[in-house]
Amino acid sequence: MTQEGKLEQQFLDYLHSERNYSVNTSTAYENDLLDFRRFLNEQAIETYQQVTFLDVRIYLTELKQKSFSRTTVARKISSLRSFYTFLLRENVIAENPFTYVSHAKNQLRLPKFFYSEEMEALFQVVYEDNETLTLRDRVLLEVLYGTGIRVSECAGILLPDLDTSYQAILIRGKGNKERYVPFGVYAEDAITDYLPKRTELMTRYKKSHDALLVNHYGDPLTTRGIRYCLTKIISKASLTRKIHPHMLRHTFATDLLNNGADMRTVQELLGHASLASTQIYTHVTKEHLKSTYMKHHPRA
């Protein structure tokens, strides 16, 4: 059995043993995987790790040309997204090329981002006072927006990871890949103001660890804890539309591209294994430009 065949079998075993899927459902998943592997062979793509977002778009086009029903296409994409989510969980791949594919309409599902006035409202919340947890939230927001790192990566930052002389942070990303990301003066000032308060809090509760971000008991702030803190900040800012913390990462990438950053640099900063994962943000900026034009130009 090939390595790709082994991965498929591991996934099918997972569906049967952990998800309790029926034989018929597992068979449908297996057929969808086989169909996709035939496509990869035709494209001379040897491994599942080599698949990019653009390959997925080509596959979707092929399914459409074969006149599959919308329901069938939706099922196939759902099967493959689940398979790649499994590979991601098993650290076989670093990025899921099916993440931003909307199977319902065979269109791009564009990442949502914060508008400038929304970012201003968020920052107003974390600069309203200099209490310990407010300073912690200030670091949280400045670092997430200023570096574009994932929430899970932010939770993993240790004090030795901070290189203040170069204004950079060592980040451990997906698949335990390490990268350095720069941070600006706002994040640096926020960290400088926060660290003495962090020390006081940890001393009070007799805690000893290197995690940069701590909760109100001085323990390391978990990924779940960060999401909770961000949700509270968003709530205090009285933002009305549906918002999630990962939008800070989307906003980081979108703002860089809108201000002239090149794609390769943004890819490296985000820690994307494939450039195709970063190219999604060019669609966001184009949509934003179009909507701004349609809204403000007198002859739009």
Swiss-Prot record:
Protein family: Belongs to the 'phage' integrase family. XerC subfamily.
Function: Site-specific tyrosine recombinase, which acts by catalyzing the cutting and rejoining of the recombining DNA molecules. The XerC-XerD complex is essential to convert dimers of the bacterial chromosome into monomers to permit their segregation at cell division. It also contributes to the segregational stability of plasmids.
Catalytic residues (UniProt): 150, 174, 246, 249, 272, 281
Cellular compartment(s): Cytoplasm
InterPro entries xref list: CB, DNA_brk_join_enz, Integrase-like_cat_sf, Integrase_catalytic, Integrase_recombinase_N, Integrase_SAM-like_N, Recomb_XerC, Tyrosine_recombinase_XerC/XerD
Coiled coil: none
Alphabetically ordered keywords of this record: Cell cycle, Cell division, Chromosome partition, Cytoplasm, DNA integration, DNA recombination, DNA-binding
Annotated gene: xerC
UniProt name for this protein: Tyrosine recombinase XerC
Residues covered by the Core-binding (CB) domain: 2-88
